[in-house]
Amino acid sequence: MRFWLDGGHNPAAGRAIAATLATLPKRDTHIICGMLNTKDVTGFLAPIAAHCASLTTVTIPNEVNAVSSADLAEVGRSCAIPSREASDVHAALQDLSQRHPQARILICGSLYLAGHVLRENEPST
């Protein structure tokens, strides 16, 4: 399993991610996404839809403006992406790694989410 972390969160980032995914060797890509309600969620997800096998949504921890994982999954479904919710990024990674061990996993949708993932995975000193 390979996983990537990207802070992209707007339509231009969605298009850039889609363009990059289109150039990569064939492999299922599963997205873990959390976003803020101040962003264009559909505009971000729509370009990516053709390049991902599934979307797992999370609510960004400790962010008052976070889109709920349920609402984010609904937008994913409206973009024709098979979508499910997870309690957090760790649970999403565990689930995807068990079900799709050879997959590419992209965590994206917010700089706040990216920061959270990086803080959670800092080596202890």
Residue ranges of predicted features:
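Short helix-capping segments at alpha-helix termini
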Residues: 24-28, 77-80, 125
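C-terminal helical cap/extension that packs against the catalytic core
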Residues: 2-5, 45-104
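Active-site-adjacent alpha-helix immediately C-terminal to a catalytic or transition-state-stabilizing loop
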Residues: 115-125
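Active-site-proximal loop/hinge segments that shape catalytic or ion-binding/gating pockets
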Residues: 110
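Nucleotide phosphate-binding/pyrophosphate-handling subdomain across enzymes
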Residues: 1-54
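Short active-site-adjacent structural elements
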Residues: 13, 40-41, 64-66, 93-95, ...
